[in-house]
Amino acid sequence: MPQVQNDNRFEHLLDHHHLKKTGPRLRVLSMMSSKNTATSQPDLENLMHDVDRVTLYRILNVFEEKGIIHKVFDLNGTANYAICHSNCEEHNHQDEHLHFNCTVCNNVYCLNDLNLPSINLPAGFKAENFTLYASGLCPKCSKKENKK
């Protein structure tokens, strides 16, 4: 099991969203923040053997509702979760960035630093959220591919 730190920023984040600071919640945040890719519930289940599936589902659900994490789907349709930027609010996600799906390792990356084009919707349309996907090879898989 990976090393997990109980970080004060996670306690502050839970306080900010009026959530109890439970061990499983703090561990989920720590595990998710330690990765540079989005994480699926099955991946978290494999790391957190002492937390049952229903509890983990509820943690992910409340974190998404509160704007702590956002959901992104991989190429297989599996929901993955990543920590939101600090400007997300309850029921109002601001994580409008490119999500990159690697076609080899199946990891999902949030590419937050890219400038996205503005989208002008036709009259009468109102976007409530926005998701942009790209797929291909991540740097690690691309490097392996080039060595062949």
Go through the PLM ranges and name each one.
Residues 4-18:
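Short, Lys/Arg-enriched N-terminal segment that forms or immediately precedes the first helix
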Residues 38-45:
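Short acidic, hydrophobic short linear motifs in intrinsically disordered regions
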